[in-house]
Amino acid sequence: MGKTNVSHKLYITLLAGGMGKRMQSNLPKVLHKVNGETMIVRLMKQVIKLNPDKILVVVGKFYSEISSEIKQHINDNRIEFVVQKEPLGTGDAVKCTLPLLINDNIDNIILNGDVPMIQHSTIKNIYNYYLETKSKLLITSIHLSNPTGCGRIILDENFGFSEIIEEKDCTEDQKKLTLVNCGIYVCNSKILKQSIPQISNNNSQKEYYLTDLVKIYNNEPSNNINLFILPRNKEIEIYNINTKEQLEYIESVSK
């Protein structure tokens, strides 16, 4: 992917520090294999095709195992590993990367490490839309026939983005909405450095959620948040794997 925006650097951040408890395995979640290849390596191979300036891989207690797996299959000096010392949530994971954002002209694509089916062309389309709309923060969404378990996207009266509401906080009417958050964000480094430190852990899990970045920045008077809606046929690409059953499903449809 040639640099569409020559004045801005492009960083891609992969959140791979999750414990993956629901996998019921001693193996880190992103090291589970989809048809013979680990999730993280599959994802890395797609990300590299975007020709970013840097790839930040946020890891936790399994730093050694995950970094070893990546280095075994991919030799690229643009990869940097960022250690999240405690599993305090996705917002904290991104906070760990802030010291590496050395200036305000870095575009950051942030995505989870457990979406092994995503294609570089899809990520490229998301980033191009971010550039075309001159966004400061872009949220990726999709309509799902079964949105159970996903955060819902709330639109304003002009059908623009309003907020993300996690399912547990949704009213019965909001649960009927099918437009959901994909967990893929594009954001300017200046916004990250301003907003991420404001995220609190005032929730039942005592974790710092990346979705709170949206709430915080949405309160800024000059915010420029845009929404990119993926076509429905991309559902398999943004499918998060959290359980063995989900892993088996992805393997069955990707052969």
UniProtKB/Swiss-Prot annotation:
Pathway: Nucleotide-sugar biosynthesis; UDP-N-acetyl-alpha-D-glucosamine biosynthesis; UDP-N-acetyl-alpha-D-glucosamine from N-acetyl-alpha-D-glucosamine 1-phosphate: step 1/1. It is an enzyme of class 2 (transferase). The keyword Acetylation does not apply. It holds the Pfam family NTP_transferase. Coiled coil: none annotated. It catalyses: N-acetyl-alpha-D-glucosamine 1-phosphate + UTP + H(+) = UDP-N-acetyl-alpha-D-glucosamine + diphosphate. GO terms for molecular function: UDP-N-acetylglucosamine diphosphorylase activity. Its EC number is 2.7.7.23. GO terms for biological process: UDP-N-acetylglucosamine biosynthetic process. It comes from the Viruses. Keywords: Nucleotidyltransferase, Transferase. PANTHER family: BIFUNCTIONAL PROTEIN GLMU, NUCLEOTIDYL TRANSFERASE. This is Probable UDP-N-acetylglucosamine pyrophosphorylase. The lineage of its organism: Viruses, Varidnaviria, Bamfordvirae, Nucleocytoviricota, Megaviricetes.
